């Protein structure tokens, strides 16, 4: 039975909501996915994520193929063209099906008069594909990053920037966190082997396992029973560094969606954990994750800049501050970040981070441990932030966690390893 919707037009609408309205794909996609069949959901995700991952290349090709861009009310048709080009370049969908479905997208978008234009541009691309790709390989569109971000990465990592860009442009590996309350990692790896799922342990992070090929969570042994959680390896490093202990008062600040909250409780099930986030909606995810794993934490809505409003004068033995950041370390998981962020955001985020760390420091007990973490790779949010904090606070001591000259440890995204992530471990004197 033929569907009564056109998937390519839905993808074009989603891309428009990201690029024109500044919404994230994780906000846009769930409601759109409710309108389509289960089997089409993965394809919609692939079309949206893939198109945004290689956006500059697609944009450049369209500029060569059209005398003037489609603007105003026709802008969604421009995104439809991008979706068409993405399929021709990066998917195994037969070209005739790509053309037929993408051209029909113009009808679904109530622009049937533009069917001929869409068809013509896609066919012209097929004829000129080899020549266009050769030319595209010699201009800046090949980096698939906005120029401001490319410049920042080049300045921060003069010897490594190309590897970082390359990692950002690839699909991410799927990492799991084995729940040590149920199984050792070795035991769970055996269960996966019996289920025919190929995986390997992380060399450093004790609960982390990488799947050699992604699979549905429903295929993972004991997922519904909380035996395992999907979480990137670098994100797991936060709790390894925090080293929570039973009986301690622990704060997970900026906790949503709860991956680190639950990891703390798996590591120290008798700890008293408070999970706080400013976003009431995202706190629902924290509660869902706690429920699936049958763990308990005190979950509160609150602003990290005003902790007295949600914890009074309470002090904690350990604090994990996973600060709001540019998310430049997780671009491969969320390619829309490249187009949602602006250069001016970085200074604003650094100011917000400084405000939060200042506000929460008095709530750490003397002798207590704070881990400051971000999923950014930009020094302004990471090593520079920690250096400035240490200069302001004689009562803070940095625990060395890396071999760099800068304070803290900076993980960079790697095709076979974790995302870009920064951690610094501070002890209150």
UniProtKB/Swiss-Prot annotation:
The keyword S-adenosyl-L-methionine applies. Gene3D superfamilies: Helix hairpin bin, NusB-like, Sun protein, domain 3, Vaccinia Virus protein VP39. It is an enzyme of class 2 (transferase). InterPro entries: MeTrfase_RsmB-F_NOP2_cat, MeTrfase_RsmB-F_NOP2_dom, NusB-like_sf, NusB_RsmB_TIM44, RCMT, rRNA_ssu_MeTfrase_B, rRNA_ssu_MeTfrase_B_ent, RsmB-like_ferredoxin. GO terms for biological process: regulation of DNA-templated transcription; rRNA base methylation. CDD domains: AdoMet_MTases, Methyltransferase_Sun. It is found in: Cytoplasm. The active site is at 375 (nucleophile). Keywords: Cytoplasm, Methyltransferase, RNA-binding, rRNA processing, S-adenosyl-L-methionine, Transferase. It holds the Pfam family RsmF-B_ferredox. S-adenosyl-L-methionine binds at residues 254-260, 277, 303, 322. The keyword Transferase applies. PANTHER family: NOL1_NOP2_SUN FAMILY PROTEIN _ ANTITERMINATION NUSB DOMAIN-CONTAINING PROTEIN (PTHR22807:SF61), NOP2 YEAST -RELATED NOL1/NOP2/FMU SUN DOMAIN-CONTAINING (PTHR22807). HAMAP family: 16SrRNA_methyltr_B. Specifically methylates the cytosine at position 967 (m5C967) of 16S rRNA. Belongs to the class I-like SAM-binding methyltransferase superfamily. RsmB/NOP family. This is Ribosomal RNA small subunit methyltransferase B. It comes from Serratia proteamaculans (strain 568). The lineage of its organism: Bacteria, Pseudomonadati, Pseudomonadota, Gammaproteobacteria, Enterobacterales.
């Amino acid at each position: 039975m033929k569907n009564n919707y056109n998937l390519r037009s839905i993808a074009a609408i989603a891309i428009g909501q990201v690029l024109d309205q500044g919404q994230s794909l994780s906000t846009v996609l769930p409601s759109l996915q409710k309108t389509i069949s289960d089997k089409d959901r993965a394809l919609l995700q692939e079309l949206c994520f893939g198109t945004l991952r290689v956006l500059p290349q697609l944009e450049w090709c369209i500029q060569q193929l059209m005398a003037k861009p489609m603007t105003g009310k026709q802008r969604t048709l421009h995104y439809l063209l991008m979706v068409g080009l993405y399929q021709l370049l990066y998917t195994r969908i037969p070209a005739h099906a790509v053309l037929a479905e993408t051209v029909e997208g113009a009808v679904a978008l109530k622009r049937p008069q533009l069917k001929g234009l869409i068809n013509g541009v896609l066919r012209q691309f097929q004829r000129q594909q080899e020549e266009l790709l050769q030319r595209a390989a010699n201009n800046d569109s090949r980096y698939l990053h906005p120029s401001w971000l490319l410049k920042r990465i080049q300045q921060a990592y003069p010897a490594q920037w190309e590897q970082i860009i390359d990692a950002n442009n690839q699909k991410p590996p799927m990492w799991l966190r084995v729940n040590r309350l149920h199984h050792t990692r070795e035991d769970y790896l055996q269960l996966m082997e019996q289920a025919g799922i190929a995986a390997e342990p992380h060399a450093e992070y004790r609960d982390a396992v990488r799947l050699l090929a992604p699979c549905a969570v429903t295929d993972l042994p004991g997922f519904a029973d909380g035996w395992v959680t999907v979480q990137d390896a670098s994100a797991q490093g936060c709790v390894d560094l925090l080293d929570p202990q039973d009986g301690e008062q622990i704060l997970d600040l900026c906790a949503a969606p709860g991956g680190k909250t639950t990891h703390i409780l798996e590591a120290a099930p008798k700890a008293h954990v408070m999970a706080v986030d400013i976003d009431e909606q995202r706190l629902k995810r924290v509660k869902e994750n706690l429920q699936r794993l049958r763990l308990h934490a005190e979950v509160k809505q609150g602003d990290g800049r005003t902790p007295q409003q949600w914890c009074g004068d309470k002090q904690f033995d350990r604090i994990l501050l996973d600060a709001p950041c540019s998310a430049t370390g997780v671009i491969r998981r969320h390619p829309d970040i490249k187009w949602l962020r602006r250069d001016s955001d970085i200074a604003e985020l650094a100011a917000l981070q400084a405000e939060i760390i200042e506000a929460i420091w008095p709530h750490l007990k003397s002798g207590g441990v704070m881990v400051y973490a971000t999923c950014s790779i930009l020094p302004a949010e990471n090593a520079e932030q920690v250096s400035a904090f240490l200069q302001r606070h004689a009562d803070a001591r940095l625990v060395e966690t890396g071999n760099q000259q800068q304070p803290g440890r900076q993980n960079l995204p790697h095709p076979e390893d974790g995302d870009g992530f920064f951690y610094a471990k501070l002890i209150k004197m």
